[in-house]
């Protein structure tokens, strides 16, 4: 059975090299230690386009990349603080009398607490 997989893999390698040879696309090597096709579909993605843009020169691409990185860092920081914030809100909600609570706020606090616990469980499962 194992030899069938080896034969199948060899056939796929031969077939893919023949298809690549027939396609006629010229591959260009960039300084990223990988070879990419000039018309690759991945180039249409915004992050890849910003990284390898040949048409846009100057600070426009850098500004967009910095905005994305700032937003990503803000989101990550918020996710890291979410469990602590939920715990503080949970403690505060216990100290307030039930008659003084607004039902909507109590529900939001409870949802945040459960979301924080779910995040912690996911992180511990990944480890």
Curated annotation (Swiss-Prot):
- Quote the subcellular location field of this record: Secreted; Host nucleus; Host cytoplasm
What coarse category fits the chief subcellular location reported for this protein? secreted
| Signal peptide residue numbers | 1-21
Keyword annotations for this protein? Host cytoplasm, Host nucleus, Secreted, Signal, Virulence
What GO terms fall under cellular component here?
extracellular region; host cell cytoplasm; host cell nucleus
Top-level taxon in the UniProt lineage: Eukaryota
Short sequence motif named RxLR-dEER, residue ranges: 48-65
Read off the domain note: The RxLR-dEER motif acts to carry the protein into the host cell cytoplasm through binding to cell surface phosphatidylinositol-3-phosphate.
What's its job? Secreted effector that completely suppresses the host cell death induced by cell death-inducing proteins.
Which protein family is it in? Belongs to the RxLR effector family.
Protein name per the record: Secreted RxLR effector protein 7
Q: Which organism is it from?
A: Plasmopara viticola (Downy mildew of grapevine)
The lineage, from the top, is: Eukaryota, Sar, Stramenopiles, Oomycota, Peronosporales
């Amino acid at each position: 059975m194992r030899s069938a997989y080896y034969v199948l893999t060899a056939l796929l390698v031969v077939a893919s090299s023949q298809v690549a040879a027939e396609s006629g696309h010229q591959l260009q090597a960039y300084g990223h230690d990988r070879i990419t096709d000039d018309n690759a579909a991945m180039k249409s993605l915004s992050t890849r386009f910003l990284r390898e843009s040949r048409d846009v020169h100057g600070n426009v691409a850098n500004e967009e990349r910095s905005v994305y990185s700032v937003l990503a860092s803000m989101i990550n920081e918020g996710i890291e603080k979410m469990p602590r914030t939920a715990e503080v809100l949970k403690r505060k909600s216990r100290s307030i009398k039930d008659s003084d609570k607004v039902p909507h706020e109590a529900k939001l606090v409870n949802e945040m607490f459960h979301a924080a616990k779910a995040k912690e469980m996911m992180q511990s499962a990944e480890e």
